[in-house]
């Protein structure tokens, strides 16, 4: 049982080791304040190991298959005790470790511009990332995050910094068996920091004002096992102090 994920996980001693063949291509560019980076990749994974949620009906079918195998190997064995109570998982979702060949294809990129402003540096950037993961015999790999668009503004000056980031996360409807979809959301975060000399300049205090999920969106991380029960934190505003001496 794994209480943190709400799963009753069933292992398999016959699982093989994964074998992966990967290709990654990365490009970088920077000139006169303009910058860009891009990566494309493909991962070909043989015997990819994953955790698959299953319904009680599917579990009963698996139990019957294993039960029949046990009868073949143990003729005459009394079968009343072997499976009694095995359908009681304490309210946890039953999950089996499975194995299939899979392909992961995707890309990520960021481009932007930096300018000098009021004795400091301000940068504007836009980025996007995306992964498409499918099994070679059909169907999607579970718990794969959807496409994201990321917009950010950063400013830095000696002893001072500020940032504003908006992440537009798309819905995820490319689902594995018994997997639930997640809706799109916008996550807006802000942070402002000021460094203050202390102890006659021998130390430093960093004061940071931050605000996360300013729009107070109901957001769910698709790769989380508990996304349906536990969304990401709502609006969160705080003040943080860090001292160095």
Map each language-model feature to its residues:
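Surface-exposed extracellular loop regions of Gram-negative outer-membrane beta-barrel proteins
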Residues: 1-22, 40-66, 71-89, 167-177, ...
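Outer-membrane beta-barrel channels and translocator barrels
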Residues: 20, 30-34, 114-119, 156-160, ...
């Amino acid at each position: 049982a794994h209480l943190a994920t709400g799963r009753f996980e069933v292992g398999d001693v016959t699982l093989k080791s994964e074998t992966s063949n990967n290709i990654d291509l990365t490009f970088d560019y920077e000139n006169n304040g303009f910058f860009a980076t891009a990566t494309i990749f493909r991962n070909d994974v043989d015997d990819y190991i994953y955790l698959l949620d299953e319904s009680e009906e599917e579990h009963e079918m698996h139990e019957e298959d294993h039960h029949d195998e046990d009868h073949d190997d143990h003729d005459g064995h009394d079968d009343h005790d072997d499976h009694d109570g095995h359908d009681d998982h304490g309210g946890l979702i039953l999950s089996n470790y499975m194995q299939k060949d899979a392909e992961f294809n995707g890309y990520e990129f960021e481009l932007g511009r930096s300018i000098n402003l009021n004795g400091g540096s301000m940068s504007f950037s836009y980025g996007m990332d995306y992964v498409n993961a499918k099994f070679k015999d059909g169907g999607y790999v579970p718990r794969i995050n959807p496409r994201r668009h990321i917009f950010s503004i950063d400013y830095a000056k000696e002893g001072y910094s500020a940032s504003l980031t908006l992440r537009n996360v798309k819905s995820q409807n490319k689902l594995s068996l018994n997997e639930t979809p997640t809706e799109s959301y916008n996550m807006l975060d802000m942070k402002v920091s000021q460094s203050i000399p202390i102890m006659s300049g021998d130390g430093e205090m960093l004061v940071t004002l931050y605000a996360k999920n300013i729009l107070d969106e109901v957001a769910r991380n698709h790769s989380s096992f508990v996304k349906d029960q536990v969304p990401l934190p709502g609006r969160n505003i705080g003040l943080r102090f860090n001292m160095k001496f």
